[in-house]
UniProtKB/Swiss-Prot annotation:
It comes from Physcomitrium patens (Spreading-leaved earth moss). InterPro entries: FAD/NAD-bd_sf, Sti35, Thi4_fam. Involved in biosynthesis of the thiamine precursor thiazole. Catalyzes the conversion of NAD and glycine to adenosine diphosphate 5-(2-hydroxyethyl)-4-methylthiazole-2-carboxylic acid (ADT), an adenylated thiazole intermediate. The reaction includes an iron-dependent sulfide transfer from a conserved cysteine residue of the protein to a thiazole intermediate. The enzyme can only undergo a single turnover, which suggests it is a suicide enzyme. May have additional roles in adaptation to various stress conditions and in DNA damage tolerance. It catalyses: [ADP-thiazole synthase]-L-cysteine + glycine + NAD(+) = [ADP-thiazole synthase]-dehydroalanine + ADP-5-ethyl-4-methylthiazole-2-carboxylate + nicotinamide + 3 H2O + 2 H(+). This is Thiamine thiazole synthase 3, chloroplastic. The lineage of its organism: Eukaryota, Viridiplantae, Streptophyta, Embryophyta, Bryophyta. One of its GO terms (biological process) is thiamine biosynthetic process.
Length: 357
């Protein structure tokens, strides 16, 4: 039986196995021994109960409801063992996606279709999703311009169709749907409440990220020493959004160390120009680092797009295929991608993929 780093049995094709010996009290991941009290077992969820069976079953007597007993230490061990296992597994990973907004989530979702690609998502907020929980000015609806609605069809998000765009009744419907589908995949791990403080640079190549708890990253000036951790990666996808406390941090760091010349910042709003430009210029800005989403507008000085989200989804998809190309795998950019994709999806031009330093 193959068990993912999260301790969930996954069947064939899992990248990392938690190997357990029958009768043994220890396991190992990537050569590191881990404690486990018993052999893990896969149990499928029971079929959803109807309202009639819910109230007729004695186990669901809401006036006398009883939970199975548990020791508090078991809860602590289960959480800690799985999280530490995930950290060990992703200390050296294939792709790190920095930022779990709509572009970062779309990128990770597209990457996760290849079960042999390990994906770690680093998000400084406790709640992933970036600005995609609401539309503009804290309104509920999300606007997606065609033809990006085909991505919504793929992940099965319902919408109201207009002539040139579609409307999702609440932005949270998109974000919750893509997260639930993405995080169920065994080759993906989301590290939320974790900040990318810096980059790992070897020569002229980005080779990973420097990480820390987000609360620590925001409070270095209050303590004497709170050193970070690291994640090595073959590819880093920076989807840190537009300017802000954690905004555009990837390209800002590249500028500060002289790997790119400038980060002019996004221009004033122009929806029609902005979305096309963001998808077109999603690219590998330096070897090992791909920029996607609104961070593209920050590095290029292109217009901001405001409360329309199609470019975030397609820019994220394009970033994923650029990452696959960097890994030497089939991808849509090179036209050799075989899995189940929409034939109507035509990625924007990929000329000049690497910006000059």
């Amino acid at each position: 039986m193959s068990i993912s780093a999260a301790g969930v049995a996954t069947g064939l094709g899992a990248n990392v196995e938690l190997k357990s010996n029958v009768g043994s009290s220890s396991s190992s991941v990537a050569g590191v021994r881990l404690f486990t009290s018993r052999k893990a077992q896969l149990r499928r969820c029971a079929a959803p109960a109807t309202s009639a069976s819910l109230y007729s079953d004695a186990n669901y007597d809401l006036n006398n409801y009883k939970f199975a007993p548990i020791k508090e230490s078991i809860v602590a061990r289960e959480m800690t063992r799985r999280y530490m296992t995930d950290m060990i597994t992703h200390a050296d990973t294939d792709v790190v996606v920095v930022g779990a907004g709509s572009a970062g989530l779309s990128c990770a979702y597209e990457l996760s279709k290849n079960p042999n690609v390990k994906v770690a998502i680093v998000e400084q907020s406790v709640s992933p999703g970036g600005g995609a929980w609401l539309g503009g000015q804290l309104f509920s609806a999300m606007i997606v311009r065609k033809p990006a609605h085909r991505f919504l069809d793929e992940i099965e998000v319902p919408y109201e169709e207009m002539e040139n765009y579609v409307v999702i009744k609440h932005a949270a419907l998109f974000t919750s749907t893509i997260m639930s589908k993405l995080l169920a995949r065994p080759n993906v791990k989301l590290f939320n409440a974790v900040a990318a403080e810096d980059l790992i640079i070897r020569g002229d190549r980005v080779s990973g990220v420097v990480t820390n708890w987000a609360l620590v990253a925001q409070n270095h000036n209050t303590q004497s020493c709170m050193d970070p951790n690291v994640m090595e990666a073959k590819v880093v996808v920076s989807s840190c959004g537009h300017d802000g406390p954690f905004g555009a941090t990837g390209v800002k760091r590249l500028r500060s160390i002289g790997m790119i010349e400038s980060v002019p910042g996004m221009k004033c709003l122009d929806m029609n120009a902005a979305e096309d430009a963001i998808v077109k210029h999603t690219r590998e800005v330096v070897p090992g680092m791909i920029v996607t989403g609104m961070e593209v507008a920050e590095i290029d000085g292109s217009p901001r797009m405001g409360p329309t989200f199609g470019a975030m989804m397609i820019s994220g998809q394009k970033a994923a295929h650029l990452a696959l190309r960097a890994l030497g795998l089939p991808n849509e950019v090179d036209g050799n991608y075989k899995p189940n994709v929409h034939p109507e999806l035509v990625l924007a031009s990929t000329d000049d993929m690497t910006a000059s330093a």
